């Protein structure tokens, strides 16, 4: 069984990667920071596949999923953990660009990735 976990380079995502690999699953760990993912690969071995992924770049998300090698290409479980928190100032001072980036990542990116993985 293969699990795709976004936000895998730190925090809950990183911890879930360790937990699932140690439980015997294959894990695709996706994040923007490949250097952190490579460190996890070194730690977790061949059951972990690092995938550089920017959820706001739809064409690259589709290409990244299409490039997954066997046996990692067939995703059985998606954990949409990736996200960020920007534009947290009071509404009258918050930067709209931060809000747009956060919505593109946390809402649209999640929806797009889910749609791509669902046909499997």
Locations of the language-model features?
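Conserved glycine-rich Rossmann-like NAD(P)H-binding loop of the short-chain dehydrogenase/reductase
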Residues: 23-39
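A short, exposed helix-loop element centered on a Lys and neighboring polar residues
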Residues: 114-115
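Conserved hydrophobic beta-strands of the Rossmann-like cofactor-binding core
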Residues: 2-5, 78-79
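The beta1-alpha1 cofactor-binding region of Rossmann-like NAD(H)/NADP(H)-dependent oxidoreductases
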Residues: 53-63, 96
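Conserved glycine-rich cofactor-binding loop
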Residues: 9-10
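Substrate-binding pocket helix/loop in short-chain dehydrogenase/reductase
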Residues: 89-91, 95-100
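Conserved NAD(P)H cofactor-binding loop of Rossmann-fold oxidoreductase domains
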Residues: 82-87
């Amino acid at each position: 069984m293969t699990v795709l976990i976004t936000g895998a380079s730190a925090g809950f995502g990183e911890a879930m990667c360790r937990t699932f690999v140690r439980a015997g699953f294959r894990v695709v760990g996706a994040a923007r920071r490949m250097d952190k993912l490579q460190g996890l690969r070194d730690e977790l071995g061949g059951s972990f596949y690092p995938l550089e992924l920017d959820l706001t770049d739809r064409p690259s998300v589709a290409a990244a999923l299409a490039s997954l090698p066997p046996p990692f290409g067939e995703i059985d479980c998606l954990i949409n953990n990736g996200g960020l928190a920007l534009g947290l100032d009071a509404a009258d001072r918050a930067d709209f660009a931060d809000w747009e980036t956060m919505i593109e990542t946390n809402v649209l990116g999640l929806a797009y990735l889910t749609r791509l993985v669902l046909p499997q």
